[in-house]
Regions:
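Secretory targeting and sorting signals
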Residues: 1-25
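N-terminal pro-sequences and low-complexity stem/linker regions of secreted or lumenal proteins
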Residues: 24-368
Length: 368
């Protein structure tokens, strides 16, 4: 995310044995019969900027919160962007390489496995033994898709499952006119368990596929993971195409796509929408919640502190009472364990940390 960090952090890669990352089992709170989860990640904005009185995002901060619940104490897990996305789907903490957004798309060279399935070593693309919630869903005969805006806009790159060659530079660190896709906002392509199989081309697709998939419950994936482009997620401001970017463009994106999700039969029956941010602005907030989190590959997950800052999240669901607020501390690991609970899955990595609270009755507060 921040190129200046490349000169401040040195990526060390050590050789060793392939690890086996295991899922953890811990008591699960009562979870309603959620069968369709939609996750939308926006970029680099603090809680106060997004949800304060002067927010430039009225759809998110006012209209959408009125339809669901505001998680006022939701935190990112690190800086910079990529480590948070990887956290959300795998429970793996940051490496030195992911803390600088993997400007070089290198393999993660593993030296072993630590507590809670944390893979020891450094690099970007995890060995096939390291699993994600996508792998868990597939194993349970459930479905998933990553919807990546602009992934198919390059004239020379694949239209789906797009990523650099192993060992090569990432050409998507900066937006290009007509192509504002960012590899680092697509966590699925950082796992060999996905990119080395036909699953990737089938399931890591363009955002335009979402409309057709929402048409029927049977075509709506159990997990729909949505990443806007570098303008519509609020990362860039202004954008290369002249749009304002920031929260203004992010809010417009939500105003276009969220009503489609909320109107779908799958959502109305048993859906859960989560809108959050990958991290707060780096340098302004590196705070964390939810107790100490062991991250053996880096000293500070937030570079300057223990986390990625307070960002907030909005939850909308038939199982959530509109217009409510929860001040229970949550973070991206808690989001992962909550999604796994909904689908009856074990907890991967740090999503299985003892004492971490997954979504409970404070979130699922509406009787149906």
């Amino acid at each position: 995310m921040r190129r200046l960090l490349l000169s401040l952090l040195v990526i060390g890669v050590a050789g060793g044995l392939l690890p086996m990352a295991t899922a953890q089992a811990k008591p699960k709170p009562a979870t309603p019969a959620i069968r369709h989860i939609f996750v939308i990640n926006l970029e680099n904005t603090s809680y106060d900027e997004t949800f304060g009185a002067a927010s430039p995002a009225p759809y998110l901060s006012k209209e959408l919160t009125a339809k669901g619940q505001l998680l006022s104490q939701y935190f990112a897990t690190g800086h910079v962007s990529l480590s948070n996305y990887i956290t959300q789907i795998s429970g793996q903490g940051p490496s030195k390489a992911t803390q600088v957004d993997c400007a070089t798309y290198s393999d993660f060279v593993a030296t072993g496995t630590g507590d809670l399935g944390q893979v020891l070593g450094d690099g970007c693309v995890y060995p096939a033994s390291v699993k994600t919630i996508a792998d868990q869903l597939t194993a349970k005969h459930l479905t998933w898709r990553g919807y990546m805006e602009d992934i198919g806009n390059s004239a020379t790159e694949p239209k789906t499952c797009r990523h650099p060659a192993i060992g090569g530079p990432d050409p998507t660190l900066a937006a290009r006119p007509g192509d504002m896709y960012a590899t680092r906002h697509n966590p699925f392509v950082y796992f060999h368990s996905i990119i080395d199989t036909p699953t990737c081309a089938k399931n890591v697709v363009g955002l335009d596929a979402l409309t057709a998939d929402l048409a029927k419950p049977k075509t709506t994936r159990n997990l729909s993971y949505i990443a806007p482009n570098l303008c519509h997620d609020g990362h860039d401001h202004p954008c290369v195409d002249g749009q304002p970017g920031g929260l203004v463009s992010a809010d417009a994106f939500l105003g276009e796509w969220v009503p489609k999700i909320l109107a779908s039969k799958a959502f109305k029956k048993d859906g859960l929408l989560v809108v959050t941010f990958d991290e707060s602005e780096i340098g302004a907030d590196s705070s964390d919640c939810c107790g100490p989190t062991p991250t053996p590959n880096v000293e500070q997950p937030g570079i300057q502190g223990p986390g990625g800052g307070r960002v907030g999240a909005v939850i909308v669901s038939p199982f959530v009472k509109p217009g409510t607020t929860s001040d229970t501390p949550y973070n991206h690991y808690a989001l992962l364990c909550s999604m796994e609970d909904a689908f009856g899955l074990s907890h991967l990595g740090l999503a299985g940390r003892p004492g971490l609270q997954c979504f409970g009755n404070d979130v699922y507060n509406k009787k149906t």
